[in-house]
């Protein structure tokens, strides 16, 4: 007769059942949307047809934003290439009236993310925003969301989860934005790893002879 040792069974169940509770980081990526403006998400990335109004320029990009709800930080990374104009600003807008479409005001740092490469047609950017600092926000966004950075963070992250926030890259050719991508949550790898470990434990000890 085979049995799973009680202590190991408890550990395995804990790993499977509580994995999501340990996830304090959420990774969002930019996704392209349909050019018709109906709000249909497409592949990861940023482009001109995703803009509102749309454009036919061939520039592309891809960005990620890693949110930590304990540290209250947003780690940003983006790469872009093939722009028609040179970059003039970049930031995240929120919240659009509906998911994956329409426009909204700037929520993050204005006039542009600190350190974002300006005057170029291709490049990369990486920086981490401290969401507890007023300098990470557009002052108008903070004022419209309770007057505190905490209120701004709560509503901004809700917009990210709701697909109502988009990363925009503005250029000399298209002042309103040459390429953009809506923020979309990616699967949680940390939770998946813990669940996998838990299931592996069950498999190993259920096959192990006494």
For the regions a protein language model found, what residue spans apply to each?
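Bacterial N-terminal signal peptides that target proteins for export
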Residues: 1-9, 189-190
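Metal-centered catalytic cores of metalloenzymes
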Residues: 22-90, 94-185
């Amino acid at each position: 007769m085979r049995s799973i040792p009680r202590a190991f069974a408890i550990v395995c169940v804990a790993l499977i059942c509580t994995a999501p509770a340990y996830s304090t980081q959420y990774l969002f990526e930019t996704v392209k949307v349909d050019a018709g403006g109906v709000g249909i998400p497409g592949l990861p990335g940023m482009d001109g047809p995703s803009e509102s109004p749309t454009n036919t320029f061939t520039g592309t990009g891809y960005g990620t934003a890693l949110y930590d709800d304990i540290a209250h930080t947003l780690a940003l990374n983006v790469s872009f290439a093939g722009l028609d104009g040179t970059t003039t600003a970049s930031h995240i807008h929120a919240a659009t009236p509906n998911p994956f479409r329409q426009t909204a005001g700037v929520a993050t740092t204005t006039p542009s993310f600190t350190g974002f490469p300006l005057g170029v047609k291709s490049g990369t950017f990486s920086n981490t925003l401290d969401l507890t600092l007023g300098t990470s926000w557009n002052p108008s966004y903070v004022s419209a969301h309770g007057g505190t950075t905490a209120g701004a963070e709560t509503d901004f992250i809700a917009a990210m989860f709701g697909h109502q926030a988009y990363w925009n890259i503005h250029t000399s050719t298209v002042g309103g934005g040459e390429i953009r991508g809506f923020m979309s949550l990616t699967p949680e790898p940390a939770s998946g790893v813990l669940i996998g470990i838990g299931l592996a434990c069950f498999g190993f000890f259920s096959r192990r002879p006494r």
